């Protein structure tokens, strides 16, 4: 989205001249390499779930949704680099119709990546909550049918929101909507965590009898959430500063780190699959089978 994800170099030149902070420029090869790795890793996660019937359950479907979100974020950067390469070599007319349309599609993928991650983490949090505090009713509450319906609604909403944000990208309310979803997701999950903590204190004996995997899933969610905040929060702050104080020297100084903030987003897609593999023995076994070329039963 041109107004939301326009790089730092489009910031007011006068403001940049008044800042003592030089632009931090990273080679495009770094972005491209990280993005390729992110796509391949998350594709492996998707293939593992598709090919292994033991992994075809609600929890792993939610993880697949998060993997798709991460993959879209990586594809965004790959396609952007390809578009820039074609333009620099004269294959595309600068600011032509094709480039503008391609820009909009690529920007929509970026927004889908953020929105998809937000909602995927939220449903994973809800799933973990039900697993811990409604363990006996879990399979009647979280059915495959409800899981598929939930994910379908989420991605339809994300796609519609992404298209709308691209169309109205130059309006401040759009930026506020884009950035507000991030803290709203954190508030939702924080409320779940507080409720889980309060219930845990009053039902300590009951929770101690739960399977270890249930509690392990909650810890995995905490790690995923921490990585997501660490990787995306700097960029969200960049967008807010670019919108509300683009000429302030301190804001401009922070915005000089744009490419580092962008690299953190790419790293999120690379880190998540390692978390899945490290925390899930089932997924780890599926990876081993894939790489050892064993046939799935």
Curated annotation (Swiss-Prot):
<feature type="transmembrane region" description="Helical; Name=2">
    <location>
        <begin position="59"/>
        <end position="79"/>
    </location>
</feature>
<feature type="topological domain" description="Extracellular">
    <location>
        <begin position="1"/>
        <end position="23"/>
    </location>
</feature>
<dbReference type="GO" id="GO:0004978">
    <property type="term" value="F:corticotropin receptor activity"/>
</dbReference>
<feature type="transmembrane region" description="Helical; Name=4">
    <location>
        <begin position="148"/>
        <end position="168"/>
    </location>
</feature>
<comment type="function">
    <text>Hormone receptor primarily expressed in adrenal cortex that plays a key role in regulating adrenocortical function. Upon corticotropin (ACTH) binding, facilitates the release of adrenal glucocorticoids, including cortisol and corticosterone. In addition, MC2R is required for fetal and neonatal adrenal gland development. Mechanistically, activates adenylate cyclase (cAMP), the MAPK cascade as well as the cAMP-dependent protein kinase A pathway leading to steroidogenic factor 1/NR5A1-mediated transcriptional activation.</text>
</comment>
<keyword id="KW-0472">Membrane</keyword>
<keyword id="KW-0297">G-protein coupled receptor</keyword>
<dbReference type="GO" id="GO:0005886">
    <property type="term" value="C:plasma membrane"/>
</dbReference>
<feature type="lipid moiety-binding region" description="S-palmitoyl cysteine">
    <location>
        <position position="293"/>
    </location>
</feature>
<keyword id="KW-0449">Lipoprotein</keyword>
<feature type="transmembrane region" description="Helical; Name=7">
    <location>
        <begin position="257"/>
        <end position="278"/>
    </location>
</feature>
<comment type="similarity">
    <text>Belongs to the G-protein coupled receptor 1 family.</text>
</comment>
<feature type="disulfide bond">
    <location>
        <begin position="21"/>
        <end position="253"/>
    </location>
</feature>
<feature type="topological domain" description="Cytoplasmic">
    <location>
        <begin position="279"/>
        <end position="297"/>
    </location>
</feature>
<feature type="transmembrane region" description="Helical; Name=3">
    <location>
        <begin position="105"/>
        <end position="126"/>
    </location>
</feature>
<feature type="disulfide bond">
    <location>
        <begin position="245"/>
        <end position="251"/>
    </location>
</feature>
<dbReference type="InterPro" id="IPR000276">
    <property type="entry name" value="GPCR_Rhodpsn"/>
</dbReference>
<keyword id="KW-1015">Disulfide bond</keyword>
<keyword id="KW-0325">Glycoprotein</keyword>
<feature type="topological domain" description="Extracellular">
    <location>
        <begin position="169"/>
        <end position="180"/>
    </location>
</feature>
<keyword id="KW-1133">Transmembrane helix</keyword>
<feature type="topological domain" description="Extracellular">
    <location>
        <begin position="80"/>
        <end position="104"/>
    </location>
</feature>
<dbReference type="Pfam" id="PF00001">
    <property type="entry name" value="7tm_1"/>
</dbReference>
<keyword id="KW-0807">Transducer</keyword>
<feature type="topological domain" description="Extracellular">
    <location>
        <begin position="245"/>
        <end position="256"/>
    </location>
</feature>
<comment type="subunit">
    <text>Homodimer. Interacts with corticotropin (ACTH). Interacts with MRAP; this interaction targets MC2R to the plasma membrane. Interacts with MRAP2; competing with MRAP for binding to MC2R and impairing the binding of corticotropin (ACTH).</text>
</comment>
<feature type="topological domain" description="Cytoplasmic">
    <location>
        <begin position="50"/>
        <end position="58"/>
    </location>
</feature>
<feature type="glycosylation site" description="N-linked (GlcNAc...) asparagine">
    <location>
        <position position="17"/>
    </location>
</feature>
<dbReference type="InterPro" id="IPR017452">
    <property type="entry name" value="GPCR_Rhodpsn_7TM"/>
</dbReference>
<keyword id="KW-0675">Receptor</keyword>
<feature type="transmembrane region" description="Helical; Name=5">
    <location>
        <begin position="181"/>
        <end position="199"/>
    </location>
</feature>
<feature type="glycosylation site" description="N-linked (GlcNAc...) asparagine">
    <location>
        <position position="12"/>
    </location>
</feature>
<keyword id="KW-1003">Cell membrane</keyword>
<dbReference type="InterPro" id="IPR001671">
    <property type="entry name" value="Melcrt_ACTH_rcpt"/>
</dbReference>
<feature type="transmembrane region" description="Helical; Name=6">
    <location>
        <begin position="218"/>
        <end position="244"/>
    </location>
</feature>
<dbReference type="GO" id="GO:0007189">
    <property type="term" value="P:adenylate cyclase-activating G protein-coupled receptor signaling pathway"/>
</dbReference>
<keyword id="KW-0564">Palmitate</keyword>
<dbReference type="InterPro" id="IPR001168">
    <property type="entry name" value="ACTH_rcpt"/>
</dbReference>
<feature type="topological domain" description="Cytoplasmic">
    <location>
        <begin position="127"/>
        <end position="147"/>
    </location>
</feature>
<feature type="transmembrane region" description="Helical; Name=1">
    <location>
        <begin position="24"/>
        <end position="49"/>
    </location>
</feature>
<protein>
    <recommendedName>
        <fullName>Adrenocorticotropic hormone receptor</fullName>
    </recommendedName>
</protein>
<feature type="topological domain" description="Cytoplasmic">
    <location>
        <begin position="200"/>
        <end position="217"/>
    </location>
</feature>
